[in-house]
């Protein structure tokens, strides 16, 4: 029996960081139950200097909106195409080109990271979730009280096995050649498509699926499956503060979560 979208229960929430900074929430999410489209994005921007230097222009927020709107529009227009993989890849490629146009209007000297976004973009077709992941967002599948982590580990592994040297990976796969983080992000460069990872999950009745930004990653990874099953996205976001590194209390990062119960 096929999983029908009208049997799917969906909850979601987003919360900006709790620090006294000028930076707004740069996460983005999209839930379209009717079309089976679910997206979580995490914006990346770093100004030279401190966030407290207000007013803070959220270039990553702007990029996230550009990317999200373009990806969603493309997927909606091509849902009847036979290959979800091709739909997703073409959607993010075209959206990334739009980021490139945005970036050309900005001075790259304004940021130590180029304005960009990363995340998990997914389509539910029948019993199967097809998804692309880029960066350090995370997916968790709970089945029979056991957890399967996907998304973040898949992307990190892909970067780790890259044959390029460390410095080459910085230049190719991150926003900025001098930055210490070396995962792919959608920053307008064509090379980002080399780091886009596609996969699929065959779903069972009773499965619970989480798509989240990295601010909740440790909580999803280390908490017991039964606790995740029973908690709302808001409760999970609240509880994730215990994993935030000192000296920050809750919400050291923007936190966004979509919970899908099949």
Stretches found by the model and what they are:
Residues 1-262:
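PP2C/PPM-type serine/threonine phosphatase catalytic domain
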